[in-house]
Curated annotation (Swiss-Prot):
Encoding gene (name): menC
Enzyme class: lyase
GO BP of this protein: menaquinone biosynthetic process
Lineage: Bacteria, Bacillati, Actinomycetota, Actinomycetes, Mycobacteriales
E.C. number: 4.2.1.113
Pathway in which this enzyme or protein is active: Quinol/quinone metabolism; 1,4-dihydroxy-2-naphthoate biosynthesis; 1,4-dihydroxy-2-naphthoate from chorismate: step 4/7; Quinol/quinone metabolism; menaquinone biosynthesis
Protein's recorded name: o-succinylbenzoate synthase
């Protein structure tokens, strides 16, 4: 169920649309637009990527409503270890990026991006490995099974990997690859973009489940899925602002078990954010409520045409939400 009352006029009255400049290109963008909802229970973030159509983006709106109108789950831990995130940058930029994640002992490195070669991926991973003891890579489904098997060999020639995140696009490919290689496999898109988020686990196609609050419909929806998964869970952001990061930390703090560092340190990828970014202490963040700074909201406000674009998007997604919930 979607928390209420969250009528469409009420949502739009509480809306702030911001454009956050990024330090480096990530997912092909240099500015991250998100819509924030100032609700009676707190702040929610609707940041479905621009190319997502309403049927997929609606879950992200559900997450924003959940945060703005609902109540957070009980906190089980006050410290969430995080990983550094390294985009597809030249090796020379790696030290500067890692410095934004003080104390992090795990790093996730983007690989298999358009225009990048396996050789450049290996160089980037090795540059990270020289500075951080635990390395995982994220291919965003960019490889075939054969390419992923080849990459697994190349990327582990100079040291181990914690896991390969979404090396191939489909559940069938992940299952086949898992039979062929020894490197653990984590599923991300195969969970958050699937009609059945549990299919990849039932197929024995992953060793780790990467769960993201917004695409799964909110903190409570994520925790419900996590309770049905019998493999370790990693909570990660979807290039969220400080508001979305707070929701991710809330989810991570509520899990019964947390075996791996979480991908919730991505606030360091922004030049400016809507609130003062949380600084990791000894590689960890504490769950806490985030209230955007009014001055930052004004300074980072999106252009009028972009604000209207997000209003139209919410209008398109909202009916899909409540149809799904049975209201």
């Amino acid at each position: 169920m979607i928390p209420g009352p969250a009528t469409l006029p009420d949502l739009l009255d509480r809306l702030h649309v911001v454009a956050l400049p990024m330090r480096v290109r990530f997912r092909g963008i240099t500015t991250r637009e998100v819509a924030l909802i100032e609700g009676p229970s707190g702040w929610g973030e609707f940041g479905a990527f621009l190319e997502y159509q309403p049927p997929e983006a609606a879950a992200w709106l559900a997450s924003a409503i959940d945060a703005a109108y609902g109540q957070p789950p009980p906190v089980r831990r006050g410290r969430i270890p995080i990983n550094a995130t390294v985009p597809a940058v030249p090796p020379a930029q790696v030290p500067e990026l890692l410095a934004r994640f003080p104390g992090a002992r795990t790093a996730k490195v983007k690989v298999a991006e358009p225009g990048q070669t396996l050789a450049s991926d290996v160089e980037r991973v090795n540059a990270v490995r020289a500075l951080v003891p635990t390395v995982r890579v994220d291919a965003n489904g960019g490889w075939s099974v054969d390419q992923a098997a080849q990459a697994a060999v190349a990327l582990t020639a100079d040291g181990p990997l914690e896991y390969l995140e979404q090396p191939c696009a489909t559940v069938g490919e992940l299952a086949e690859l898992r039979r062929r290689i020894e490197v653990p496999i984590a599923a991300d898109e195969a969970i958050r973009k699937a009609e059945d988020p549990l299919a990849v686990v039932r197929a024995g196609a992953a060793d780790v489940a990467v769960l993201k609050v917004a695409p799964l419909g909110g903190v409570w929806a994520l925790l419900d899925i996590a309770a049905q998964i019998d493999i370790p869970v990693v909570i990660s952001s979807a290039l969220d602002s400080a508001v979305g990061i707070a929701a991710g930390l809330s989810a991570a703090a509520a899990l019964p078990q947390l075996q791996h560092a979480c991908g919730l340190g991505t606030g360091g990828l922004f030049v400016e954010d809507v609130a003062e970014p949380a600084i990791p202490v000894d590689g960890a963040l504490a769950p806490q409520r985030v209230v955007p700074d009014p001055a930052r909201l004004r300074a980072l406000g999106a252009a009028p045409d972009r604000r209207q674009w997000w209003i139209d998007r919410i209008k398109a997604c909202y009916p899909l939400l409540y149809r799904r919930s049975g209201d």
